[in-house]
Amino acid sequence: MFIKSLQIANKDGVIRLIKFHAGLNLIVDETPVDEASTESTKTTGNNVGKTTVLMLVDFCLGADAKGIYTDPETKKGEYTLVKNFLIETEVLITLTLVEDLDDPLAKTIVIERNFLSRKKCIRRINGLQKTIEEFE
């Protein structure tokens, strides 16, 4: 299976849609360099979402949501701002997998997850809600 797309949306609409293609896919910093600035600024590639994209794919494949909003170095501190945003705006992550990226008729699996709990929890595969046990 290949990753076809990763969509991040909330109750206000699509936040980000990342489409993948055959071959090497890169996440790069496309921040424009401010040539008018007198300060020496450099495009670093920091904070463009490389690790977050990987964590969201992992989350869709069954990982714990805490990995998204917990400090990756200490594994203890929570980023409350991030956690609250994910819950309060009802963020939904949709991962689309396909057997063949070049075949529009290829078998497709759509996995959807959100960060809500209990009855509001979304844990779907091809539109069917799954229990935690079934999802794993």
What are the functions of these language-model segments?
Residues M1-I109:
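Extreme N-terminal "head/tail" segments of very large remodeling/mechanoenzyme assemblies
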